[in-house]
Regions:
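Juxtamembrane loop-transmembrane helix junctions in multi-pass integral membrane proteins
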Residues: 3, 25, 29-32, 155, ...
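Heptad-repeat alpha-helical coiled-coil/4-helix-bundle sensor or tether segments in soluble regions
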Residues: 70-131
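Selective recognition of signaling/oligomerization transmembrane alpha-helices
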Residues: 158-201
Length: 203
């Protein structure tokens, strides 16, 4: 009986510690996935903001340099690039998936064209030719960038759902193990101890 109690205590401790560890990992994973999805969504916003600045300034043609907000454009491009760097590292290290790899690779083509054109405009604020090239690049690549980023967001969400489904299976397994453990404790420890106490009382 003593061995059974020791075994039950150790097993209970293992279940408790391991379940807490798994819960902690899943909460961290959910937070992580949410951050990835949010940053991906922000990338679409940045590309739209760059487009808005370019098209607004383009409306005034030769006077564009008096209307284009280079400070805002520079800030947006910096944020756009930093988040892209983060996504690039996360995608290559933590999302080993052919679909995300292919989508991100395609997305980078459009991203680089947008950023390179924007940076040339920022570095050459008095060049109408460079500005017009910037507008052309934006018109040719922004929609494609947003489309591939939409597909990436959808894929990240699908991966997150698959992970959640796997976590639910683990929870089910833990539930089954816990029930079996309780049956063991009741049948092999509590009931025998109860019978033993009754026997002692009768004497």
């Amino acid at each position: 009986m003593k061995k059974k109690i020791i075994f039950a205590s150790i097993f209970f401790l293992l279940i408790t510690v391991s379940s807490q560890f798994i819960f902690h990992l899943d909460i961290k994973r959910q937070s992580y996935d949410t951050k990835i999805i949010n940053i991906s969504g922000k990338q679409r916003t940045y590309s739209q903001q760059i487009t808005k600045i370019a098209l607004y300034a383009n409306e005034v043609k030769n006077l564009y340099r008096y209307y284009i907000d280079l400070d805002s454009l520079s800030t947006i491009v910096d944020d756009f690039s930093q988040d892209n760097y983060y996504l690039k590292n996360i995608t290559s290290k933590n999302y080993k998936n052919e679909t995300t790899d292919a989508l991100f690779k395609e997305n980078q083509v459009y991203f680089n064209k947008i950023v390179n054109a924007a940076n040339r405009t920022i570095d050459n604020p008095d060049s109408q030719e460079i500005f017009e090239e910037f507008v052309t690049k934006i018109k040719a690549n922004e929609a494609k960038f947003s489309a591939t980023m939409d597909n990436l967001v959808n894929e990240y969400e699908a991966i997150s759902k698959r992970k959640l489904a796997g976590f639910r299976k683990i929870l089910t397994l833990y539930g089954v193990v816990t029930v079996v453990f309780l049956i063991f404790v009741i049948w092999f420890i509590i009931i025998p101890l109860y019978k033993k106490s009754k026997t002692l009382e009768s004497h």
